[in-house]
Amino acid sequence: MYPIFLLVSSCFLFSVLAALIKFGSQFIHPIEQAFFRNLISILLLIPFVIQTKKIINKSSNIKLLVLRGIFGGITMILLFWSYSLIPLSQAMAVSFSTPLFIYLGAILFFKEKTSRLNNFIILLGFILTIIIIRPDLEIKFGVILALIAAITHAIAGLLVKKISRNESVITLMFSMVLLMTPIAGIPTMMVWSTPNIYQLYLLIIISVIATLGNFCWTKALSITKLTNLMSFDFSKLLFTTILGFIFFDEKIDLITIICGSGLILCSNIKFISVRRNEKNKTILPDN
């Protein structure tokens, strides 16, 4: 239950983050927002790093930490950029290929056992998402950015699962923003615009929400099977669709409502299944 709560919380926080980035893109380029998001996150995490004392240990895999940072940096820049170019619901819908990639990666690389229900829900969720996207529509630059980000995000997620066996969540988060700051900083120089005091407040809020969302996401992936979580990742589409409708006057058509309802049903079925399994484990006596 706790991992599911963490993942759904991260979905909500990332949806709010997407809305803030879209709003902020009117004044600050998304790449510059990505740079400040990481820079401010370093400052936010330093007290926790000091408390941890030893952030890198003998068993740390530096190469994987660097790889995770690189893929995370690419994901962030591309996602932030896509939010400014296409409707939130469409950007988030495209990113829903990420759960499918992570799901398949968990089975192939981590040999996680799955069930027919898991397979059915993840496949149905992906199909419903594709219907919402409607690929027959014009493929815009923002859609391409979101799709590439979905692939790099999945790779980053699989690396998190691999590294989390030996690393703390703080190590994973701090190493990521430490690497992502220069990655986002280089292209930021080409689009730089000095933020005023109000824009700086917005950047701080973006960074705080992104840091909280990343903590929930990283923690959730590190403490349970990936195949048990990915069906709940579709809740992001519901959150972003609602936020887009309320704040950006983005239209919600009948197809989106029907498919969105299907995604909610998928998540509820999976939730009931997890609860039932937990109760069965509790009832079974110890041998």
Model regions: which residues?
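Membrane-interface interhelical linkers
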Residues: M1-F12, I42-L67, R116, R165, ...
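Juxtamembrane helix-entry segments on the extracytoplasmic side of multipass membrane proteins
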Residues: M1-P3, F35, N57-N61, R134-I155, ...
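Hydrophobic/small/kink-forming positions within alpha-helical transmembrane segments
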Residues: C11-V16, I46, G69, G73-I77, ...
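Transmembrane alpha-helical segments that form core, pore/gating elements
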Residues: A19-K22, P30, L45, D136-P195, ...
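Helix-helix packing/entry segments at the starts of transmembrane helices
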Residues: F36, A91-S97, I163-L178, N214-I246
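Alpha-helical transmembrane segments of compact multi-pass small-molecule transporters, enriched
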Residues: I40-L44, V94-L108, F120-L123, L179-I183, ...
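Loop-to-transmembrane alpha-helix entry segments
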Residues: S95, K111-I131, K140-V143, I197, ...
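C-terminal-most transmembrane helix of multi-pass membrane proteins
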Residues: F234-N287
